[in-house]
């Protein structure tokens, strides 16, 4: 009986009580200067913030699209995904500090239908996230950080 109890205790000790987690989904933090329904406003703000904060701007050659919010070019979509329009949210393999305009509908927990001026993306514990907030706070007092799950698996 004692041996069975010890075996059960050992089994419980090595068995995770947490549900299985999808290894292709990770949590990412995003430093946000502003979210707006206007792409033109978001783009103008991103350009100004890049100059004001002396931080690189990377719009990733995205353009507005009525059906998905933002899209890559028809050629890029066709060669990468086989269909148009297409959008891949920031944070998959491009973390760091740089300004971009992203579409909120691709981020779980973000208000839908907005263009988001992002200053940085990375792991929630990445020091660059806090550093980006501190750098922007003087010029953009409403800067915020949102954390969301992001799928890193195959999207073909």
Q: Which residues are covered by each model-predicted region?
A:
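Acidic/polar low-complexity segments and flexible, solvent-exposed patches
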Residues: 11-156
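Hydrophobic helical h-region of N-terminal Sec-dependent signal peptides
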Residues: 2-10
């Amino acid at each position: 009986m004692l041996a069975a109890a010890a075996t059960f205790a050992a089994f419980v000790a090595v068995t995770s009580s947490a549900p299985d987690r999808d290894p292709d989904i990770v949590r990412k933090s995003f430093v946000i200067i502003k979210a707006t329904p206007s792409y033109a406003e978001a783009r103008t703000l991103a350009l100004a913030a890049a100059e004001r904060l002396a931080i690189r701007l990377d719009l990733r050659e995205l353009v507005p699209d009525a059906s998905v919010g933002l899209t890559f070019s028809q050629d890029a979509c066709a060669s990468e995904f086989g269909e148009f329009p297409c959008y891949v949210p920031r944070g998959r393999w491009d973390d760091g500090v740089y300004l971009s305009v992203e579409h909120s509908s691709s981020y779980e927990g973000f208000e839908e239908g907005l263009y988001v001026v992002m200053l940085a993306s990375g792991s929630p514990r990445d020091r660059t996230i806090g550093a980006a907030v501190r750098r922007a706070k003087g010029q953009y007092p409403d800067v915020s950080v949102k954390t969301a799950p992001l799928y890193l698996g195959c999207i073909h």
